[in-house]
């Protein structure tokens, strides 16, 4: 029994660090977060061209090779050059918040081991930087989810034909376990991560645009790449702003927590920050914002659920339910 528990913990620890752990959307005002759009788009353009060139050397419009080469640059921090640049380059325009000065400063190993342990204070992955792209504030971890988990969603639904509801359920299961929302991981169940995963799936589908967008054909943004005379060529520039919205922002698309004590610590610290900054961060306070997001993601799944049911938190901060959350 002890061996099984240790094995489960080891698996959780290794899988969780495939992604930067958490972010703090509260401690620094949005106006103080530098806009990194120009640099991000320059890197996106350069890395896409590098991927196309490398794919063209190896084949004549082979899709699997194209995706393989693109994922060398667009992936999580263990594999993707873009996310590595964003997370590890201290000169990259973003804001880095020390764990001991963040909303998670009261966290203990009992609230979320990977975020509460002493080593987390020295880890670049414990608390990801906050950045701004086209005036949308997001954590750098959301780029990892967008490109990394987004590709897995894309592969399951668009490549393998798995029903979208099953794909979203699987994503929620992973978020509850190996990707955060478990007290052996960070203890934070992030709806914003799920929103980034979903929109990343849309992005990867748009690369070649072989299927209509899951939100409707009117949302088709691709193709970005096309096969011409046996070579992959870029036919449209990638505009990340067309995917980013407030569902990526954890101060507006609230997270839930693995333990009741973690929930209490988080919300208590949030009240202190609100008092210091004179801001109400209640993610349910903006009816206009909620209406916009629920309308955008209103497409129905086969069981009748709107997509927003799986990626937008409409209940506010609370302890996550492991069996009845959805």
In which residue ranges do the predicted regions lie?
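N-terminal secretory signal peptides that target proteins for export/translocation
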Residues: 1-2
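Sec-dependent N-terminal signal peptides
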Residues: 5-14
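Intrinsically disordered, low-complexity, mixed-charge
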Residues: 20-170, 180-194, 198-326
């Amino acid at each position: 029994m002890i061996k099984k528990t240790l094995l489960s913990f080891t698996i959780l620890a290794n899988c969780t660090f495939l992604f930067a752990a958490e972010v703090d959307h509260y401690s620094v005002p949005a106006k103080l977060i530098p806009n990194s759009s120009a640099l991000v788009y320059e890197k996106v353009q350069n890395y896409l061209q590098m991927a196309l060139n490398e794919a063209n050397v190896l084949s004549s419009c082979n899709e699997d090779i194209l995706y393989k080469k693109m994922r060398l640059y667009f992936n999580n921090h263990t594999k993707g050059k873009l996310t590595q640049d964003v997370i590890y380059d201290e000169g990259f325009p973003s804001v880095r918040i020390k764990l001991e000065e963040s909303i998670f400063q009261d966290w203990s190993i009992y609230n979320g081991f990977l975020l509460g342990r002493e080593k987390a204070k020295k880890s670049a992955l414990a608390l990801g930087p906050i950045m701004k792209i086209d005036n949308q504030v997001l954590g750098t971890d959301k780029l990892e989810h967008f490109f990394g988990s987004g590709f897995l969603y894309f592969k399951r639904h668009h490549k393998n034909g798995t029903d979208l509801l099953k794909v979203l359920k699987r994503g929620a299961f992973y978020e509850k376990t190996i990707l955060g929302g478990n007290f052996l991981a960070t203890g934070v169940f992030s709806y914003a991560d799920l929103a980034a995963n979903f929109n990343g799936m849309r992005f990867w589908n748009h690369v070649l645009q072989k299927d209509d967008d899951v939100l409707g054909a009117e949302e088709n943004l691709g193709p970005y790449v096309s096969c011409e005379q046996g070579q992959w060529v870029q036919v449209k520039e990638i505009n990340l702003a067309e995917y980013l919205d407030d569902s990526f922002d954890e101060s507006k698309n609230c997270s839930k927590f693995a333990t009741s004590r973690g929930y209490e610590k988080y919300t208590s610290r949030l009240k202190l920050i609100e008092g210091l900054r004179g801001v109400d961060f209640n993610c349910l306070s903006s009816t206009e914002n909620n209406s916009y997001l629920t309308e955008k993601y209103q497409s129905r799944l086969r069981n009748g659920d709107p997509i927003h049911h799986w990626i937008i938190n409409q209940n506010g901060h609370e302890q996550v339910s492991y069996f009845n959350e959805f």
